[in-house]
Amino acid sequence: MLLIISFTIVSFFFIIIFSLFHLLFLQKLRYCNCEICHAYLTSSWKKDFINLSDWYTHLLRRSPTSTIKVHVLNSVITANPSNVEHILKTNFHNYPKGKQFSVILGDLLGRGIFNSDGDTWRFQRKLASLELGSVSVRVFAHEIVKTEIETRLLPILTSFSDNPGSVLDLQDVFRRFSFDTISKLSFGFDPDCLRLPFPISEFAVAFDTASLLSAKRALAPFPLLWKTKRLLRIGSEKKLQESINVINRLAGDLIKQRRLTGLMGKNDLISRFMAVVAEDDDEYLRDIVVSFLLAGRDTVAAGLTGFFWLLTRHPEVENRIREELDRVMGTGFDSVTARCDEMREMDYLHASLYESMRLFPPVQFDSKFALNDDVLSDGTFVNSGTRVTYHAYAMGRMDRIWGPDYEEFKPERWLDNEGKFRPENPVKYPVFQAGARVCIGKEMAIMEMKSIAVAIIRRFETRVASPETTETLRFAPGLTATVNGGLPVMIQERS
C-alpha cells in the first residue's frame, strides 16, 4: 500500500515538472511577443472589447486580407469568403475536423457526426440526411414543436403577462423549449423542462456543464494543462467527467429502454438509427444521438435569443413581421401556431431570422485542422497541423462583405424586388457552413425558430428589462453563443 502511495506521489510530481517544462520551454517555440499573442495571453484586449469575438472582428477588419495568425494557438483565423470556399469546398479534403479537435471534444461527442471524419462521418451524414429529409420525421418534428408551443410556451408567457413587472429570461425559455423538443425528437424522451416553476433538469445541467468545459479546452493556449488535469481527475476536468457520466448514464438508460420496448411505429431518431447500427454498439449509438441533441438544443436557442434582442431595438421590423403574419394567417389569435405551408409564405420573417443570424450567428466560429501544408486563396501560408478557423461572427460585421450598412439590422437585404427571400452564397454567410459539411438540420431549425417567433410576436409585446442587456450582448464561453446573464424581458399580451 505504501509503495502504491509513493508511486502516485512520484507520478504526480513528474507530471507537474513535465507540465512546467512544456509551458516554459516548448511553448516558446510557437510563442512570439507580437501584439496579438501578447493581448491574447494577458487578456489586455478586454480593456477595449466586451467579447473575444469583437476583438477578433476588429483584428480581421484591420487586416488587408481579412486573415490573422494567432501564433500562441497555432491558429489561422479568417473572415475572407474566398478562404472559406477554399476550406469548405475547393480543398475540403485537406481540412478535416482533425485529431486535435477529436481529442478536445472526444469525451463529450465520441464518434458523433460533429467530431468525426472519413467513413464514420460519411456514414452518419448519409443516414441523418435520409432521416431528417423524410416526410414522416418532418411531420413528427412539427407536431412536437406545435404541442410544446400550445401546451407549455404560451401558458407560461400568459402567466408572466398576467403579472405586470415580472421578469422572464427568454434565453432560458428558449433553451428549455428546444431541449424538450430535441429530446423528444432524438430519444422519444420528454424532460419536461418548460414548465413552472422551471425545474432543474439533471440532463440539461450536465449538457450545459460539459459543453462549457469542452469549449474552454478549445480556447486553452496550453493544452497540456487540461490534459494533465484530466489525467489526475482534478478541477474542471473532474467536473467535466462527472457531467459526461450523467449524460452517458441517462442516454444508456434510454437506449436500453428503447431496445426493450421495440422500434415499431417510432419516429424518434434513436429508433431509426437503431435499425442500422449494430446491436452491440450502444456507445456509438449514444455518440450519434448526443451530437444531434447538443446541436439541436443550443443553436436554436442562441439564434432566437439574438433575434428577439434585435426586435426589441427595432420595433419597425417587428411591426412588418406582424403585418406579414396577419396577411398569411389572418387577423386575430385564432391560430396560435403556423402550418408549414403558411411558414413558406413568410418571406419577411425568414429574412429577419437570417439577418439576425448574420449579426449573431449561433455558432460564432468553426475550426478545421490542415492535413498538409497549404496556401489559402488570399496567399496565407498554412502549415500542416495548423488550426484554421473561419469566423462567421466577424464575417457578418465586415463592410467588405456586406457594404457600409453592415452594422444595421436590415432584413430587406435578403429580399428581391418582389419581396421574396433571396439566399446569399453560403461562403459569404457560413452560418450553416457550406460545401460537404453544410448543416443537414437547417430546415428543421428554421421551422422551429419560425414557429416560436410567430407564436410570440402575434400574441405578445416584449421589452428588455435589464439596462445592461439593452445596450449590448455579453457572451459566455461555450460551443454556441450563449448570452451571459440571459435575456431578461417583461411580457405584455396584445389586445
Curated annotation (Swiss-Prot):
Heme binds at residue 439. The keyword Kinase does not apply. One of its GO terms (biological process) is response to wounding. It is found in: Membrane; Endoplasmic reticulum membrane. The chain crosses the membrane at residues 2-22. Its EC number is 1.14.14.49. This is Cytochrome P450 94C1. It comes from Arabidopsis thaliana.
